[in-house]
């Protein structure tokens, strides 16, 4: 098989772009980590005390083992409402259930008691 030669530059300009891109990726990862916490540790604990399963764990139990779940809008409502509505209070995505690809929509009750916002249904 022939070797594909790169056209990507290795100069200072390219290194600056790479560093800037790395910073953007880090910001994205931090935001995703914050969203995964839902309404926060206190509300997650209260949810568990009531015998309820957090939203992303419910999805993990629903989808086929070892199958991927593609979350579609984890940053919905980001920087709105003082960032108190992670993922607009809802988790949406595509997962495989019983061998069939399915659209999955699950409410996160730890975010504002499960209230819907404009961005939740947008």
Regions found by a protein language model. Name each.
Residues 1-122:
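Terminal-region recognition feature
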């Amino acid at each position: 098989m022939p070797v594909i030669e790169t056209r990507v530059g290795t100069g200072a300009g390219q290194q600056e772009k790479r560093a800037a891109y790395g910073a953007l990726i880090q910001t994205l990862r931090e935001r995703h980590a914050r969203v995964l916490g839902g309404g926060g540790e206190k509300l997650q604990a209260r949810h568990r005390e009531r015998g309820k399963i957090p939203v992303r764990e419910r999805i993990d139990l629903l989808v086929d083992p070892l199958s991927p779940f593609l979350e579609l809008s984890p940053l919905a409502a980001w920087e709105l409402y003082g960032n108190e509505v992670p993922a607009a209070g809802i988790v949406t995505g595509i997962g495989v259930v019983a061998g069939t690809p399915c659209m999955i929509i699950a409410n996160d009750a730890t975010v504002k008691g499960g209230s819907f916002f404009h961005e939740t249904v947008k």
